[in-house]
Amino acid sequence: LERGKASAEREIHIYIREGKYYLDTPLVVDAGEWKNKRLTLSAYNNEPVVLSGARKLSLKWVKQKNGIWKSKTEADKGDQLFVGGEKRILARYPNFEEGTIFNGTAADALAPARVKRWKSPGGGFIHALHARDWGDMHYVITGKDDKSILFEGGYQNNRPSNMHDKYRFVENIYEELDAPGEWFLDGKAGYLYYYPYPDENIDNEIFEIAEIPSLIEIKGIENDRASDVTVRGICFSQTSRTFMADYEPLLRSDWAIYRGAAVFIENAERCRIEDCEFTGLGGNAIFLSRHIDGCVVKGNYIHQIGASAICIVGDTSAVRSGVFKYEHSVPYE
């Protein structure tokens, strides 16, 4: 990309050879740096190319009790772990049960007797349905006192509500690491804990942990729009989860939105995302933000992701007397 920006050529085609490329920051195509150029990013000759938001870990396992192994790690963050390319389960209660709401919920997820077992739950997550089953709400645990845990969040839903008293679960808590396939990262101490499946040889597996939420950002501004960028034939994978990122309410709708994605396009014209794959993502796959004209999203395979496949969201500044929270209204005069 740096060579392309500096080139005098008007047509820039960057071919990417077969392989998996781990990014620690997103690739950014900024309108101000690509004026009057057409850019194409594509896999070379249909070779398999993966852009990953994960870090590949180098681990030396030491056996612990109760089926758990641990290893020192340089990773200090991450809430999606992949073993041999397969996503594993962040330590949770109740345990994972495929095909159920949230893959398992329990009314006693926050019961005092259970909370009392948690030595240091800060950084854990609570996931729950809206009290009237209208959607999901998410919270981060900030600590605990003598009586209960402390937490914040729930802003992903634009209809204020308590969390559901039955459909809820907790995760990312060390004391809940008790089933095959579960894991926990102690980022402060620098240890990864894992409970392998019975037939899993962890010394021979590749461990990867997702660290960034975005892989490509194509960005312009209102008076200087990004244009003529094509992304073709690339697999985007292993981004971090975004449910606790900043969310925007959208004109009294039931929901709020995280303005970001694995591929994020903002204030752009004539851009194309085609024949790509999006999988193993922690959030949105493709986001078309604010002014978008003549852009095409075509032929992509989007599966096993954490949020929406394709978002098209304008700018609320285009609305006069906008009302954002569900409970607000504009007086009639």
Region locations from a protein language model:
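Extracellular polysaccharide-degrading/modifying enzymes targeting complex plant/algal/animal polysaccharides
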Residues: 1-272, 277, 318-330
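Carboxylate/His-rich catalytic cores and anion/metal-binding grooves
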Residues: 229-232, 241-245, 295-301, 306-317
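Glycine-centered loop/turn positions within well-structured domains
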Residues: 49, 271, 284, 295, ...
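Active-site proximal loops enriched in glycine and acidic residues that flank catalytic Cys/His/Asp
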Residues: 196, 290, 314
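Low-complexity, polar/charged sequence tracts that form flexible coils or short amphipathic helices
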Residues: 265-266, 278-279, 288-289, 302-303
